[in-house]
Amino acid sequence: MTIFVILFITALVIGMVVSLSVFGNSNKKNKLFKELYFSIEETEGHVAVLYTKGGDYSAILKIDNPVTQYCADIEAYYEFSNLLTSVVRTLGEGYALHKQDVFTRKGFEGEESDNREYLSESYFNYFEGRPYTECQTYITIVQEVKKGRFNQYDEKKWGDFLVKLRKVKDILADGGIQSKYLNKKEASEYVDRICAMEFAKKNFSLTNFKAGEDHIGMGDRKMKIFSLVDVDSIGLPRLVRPYTDITVNNATMPVDLMSHVTKIPGASTVVYNQIIYIPNQRKELAALEKKKNRHASMPNPSNLIAVEDIKQVQDIIARENKMLVYGHFNMIVCCPADTDMQKPTNQLENAFNKIGIHISKRCYNQMELFVNSFPGNCFEMNEEYDRFLTLSDAAMCLMYKEHMKRSEDSPLKVYYTDRQGVPVAIDITGKEGKKKLTDNANFFCLGPSGSGKSFHMYSTWRKTGQNGSK
């Protein structure tokens, strides 16, 4: 009997060893996240540098998109697109620009103050908890390290990386965009929040992941990654602009081309990843020429169309000195666990179809896309089916360029609700705020009966008296 027990235990142990060696264990899955970064170190100027397991290093820049939502300023969209093109040109070969726009549904919380009057306090209490969408924008500058068996420290490349970081910040400052590099503590928290997909709460925790073909489970929530372009059947319009027109009261108004990502039903958090890879231009032009010759050698309608398209791209590059870049765009949509993911899927497909973009329906590598969308880890994206070649100007049109309406920095604040229904402070004089719009204080209030003229004038008079404005 003892011999049988010993043989049974031995067979059980051998089976467990074979099972672990073949199928792995939970620790093997955990390494997917543990080995994302070797470390996060702080350099001069309190700039955090993230070192990935592949040897790439990166820094995260927090900015504010310059275009105000519903501003109807077409030039502003083009100016920001051109500014990002300048950043890409400055970075050059071997770098990647990873822009992340984080959209979070929050409940409105009024500013705490002990000096408010009863009516003002009641006004803000009325809007307390009203849901609205907040947008935060981060840009990660990534330098690729040549992959090999051993990664060696290159002082020249490291120095070039630090110089490029300063140049990018200067370019943004010249374009009127305030920016700040995250320090070690801020970068660590940002990476953790990306992993937890939680940006609304001050305190958060990480949970387990359950990856499937169409979504990833995260405890009481789940998320789905939508890739904007399917490289096997690219569905993009022939002509793309940084904005699109919508109809409002029988009049057209320009909005951001990617404005649909802010209106996904049921989503609590959305991260729009926009990645631009900068390749060797000569190498890519030679590959294009080779591809054109290959298509020309087999004359049929589809090949002739391909030859014409390549010729047009070559002409644009030669005449206008444009750049070839590789792009990847995806949206991480996080919803409560009981949400039917077909609803946001249908909304995105319908919205993008209206502007001529057919999003990919074959994103089966959900966990791979999620992990490779972490800041600094973008070079792990598969070169064959996660990146597509295009001109830099076209890629910049797919960037998100807007920010939500914010309260003006002014001592003279008159509150009105924005299009989301939450209060924002407006300086109606245009001369008291940090941003001066005029030096003329003369104005009049015009409106039909019951539109709030008396309330507006009372608010203006009271604020003017409180702040001693003239």
Please provide the spans of the model-predicted regions:
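Extended, folded cores of ATP/NTP-driven motor/assembly subunits in large transport
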Residues: I3-K401
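Glycine-rich phosphate-binding loop of nucleotide-binding enzymes
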Residues: D73-Y77, S81-R89, D101, S410-K470
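Pre-P-loop entry segment of helicase/translocase ATPase cores
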Residues: L389-M399, M404-P423
